[in-house]
Amino acid sequence: MQKRNVYAVPDLPVKEIMQYFSEMEINIKASDILKPTPQSTQRIYEVLLEVYCGVKTSDLLPRINSGESIEAFEESLSCILLQKRMSGFLKRIGIDNFGLRDLVPDSRRLIGILSVVVNFSMFRDNKRHVYERVCQMNDEKLLLKNEIDEKVHNAKKELERCERDARKSIEEAKGVEEEISLLESELKDFYRHQRALVQETERSKTERNEYSDKLSSLKLMVLNLNQEITCLKTQIVSDPTKLMELLDEMRCLIAKESEIMKGLEVKRVGLKEKIEFMQVLKEDTMKAITLAISNREADKTIDKTNREISELEVQMKNLDSGINALKIRLNHVSRQISHIESKIFNLQDNDKRCSEEISAKLEKLKSNYGVVSDERNSIRGKIEENVRLTKSIEYELVKRRNEHANDITAIQSALCRLKDDVFNYFAEAKGIIDKTMSD
């Protein structure tokens, strides 16, 4: 079962209720409280809602220009809306049993409700400065919290942007590094190929020199043989057999020389092919030299790329330092938020403690109210007894006063009769005396 927030408020005198509402410029007559009607009761509730809640019941229901049934419907709906609004208002100040039956005129119930409203209004007026100060502090805290949240949000955005830039820079640096590594591998392959070409060129030069030396020696041998042939041609041969042997020997030598010449021709063709190949190698070498020159430009580009990488690394370091600064700032803001949250927690604890103290005081007041209520009932009983005694005494006093007045009246009438009798007696005596004196 839900705990009801109800505290007992004694009924205030009608005079005090009217005086308080007149100070608030609320026109409520004594007859509206002591002898309420449905119209006066509804008007009082509408005035209370307008003053304390800022709600006009006439604004809650749009008017429909139609027949009597629509007017009756609007009246019923306005009564229901008035009961709902008034029930919500009274629940907040401690009365949670306000229903449609309370719209029926009842002087005692109306005095009780107005007493609770006056008590709440007086308490609100007394604690208004505390409420306004707490509201101001709460608004300042909310404003500070919103500013801190906005700063944290902006810092997070800046941090995310820096992280994106850093990731982009890292990716670009990785791409540049991959391109540099690819260029380095291509350059190494090119250097290796150039080194192989240089070695092949040196070996071809060595072979060419060797073949040139062999060709020179062979040319010298041919020249010597030609000289010998010339010498032999000039010699005179006396013996034909020797001449035939010499011819055979010369034929053999010529055949050998022919074979040697064929071998030399083959070698010459091979050397010519070697020379052509060396020319091709020379052209390739020149191309390689041109490529080496272009490699220098590539080296310059690589150096420029390395410098850009260094600049990017410096920018990354700056971004890292900025990120660290933002993290420090974020930590500082987090500490401030924690400090504010701790303050809010302390304020909540203080509020809770104050609420507990107020609840304890209210419980104590409730218990004291029971004792005071008993004493008040006993005193009221004594007062009623005294009133009864006073009324009986007043009745006896009036009765005795009437009896005394009757006795006084009887005495006065008796005295008047006695006076008349004495006057008559003295008149008769005077007449007798006068008569006697005349005789």
From Swiss-Prot:
Listed A to Z, the keywords are: Cell cycle, Cell division, Centromere, Chromosome, Coiled coil, Kinetochore, Mitosis, Nucleus
Q: Which locations, inside or outside the cell, does it occupy?
A: Nucleus; Chromosome, Centromere, Kinetochore
Q: Which GO terms describe its biological process?
A: attachment of mitotic spindle microtubules to kinetochore; cell division; kinetochore organization; meiotic chromosome segregation; mitotic spindle organization
One example of the protein's molecular function in GO is:
protein-containing complex binding
The coiled-coil regions, if any, are 136-233, 293-332
Task: Write down a Pfam family by its short name.
Answer: Nuf2
GO CC, alphabetical: Ndc80 complex; nucleus
Q: Which family does it belong to?
A: Belongs to the NUF2 family.
Q: What does this protein do?
A: Acts as a component of the essential kinetochore-associated NDC80 complex, which is required for chromosome segregation and spindle checkpoint activity.
On assembly, the entry states:
Component of the NDC80 complex, which consists of at least NDC80 and NUF2.
Q: Any idea what this protein is called?
A: Probable kinetochore protein NUF2
The scientific name of the source species is: Encephalitozoon cuniculi (strain GB-M1)
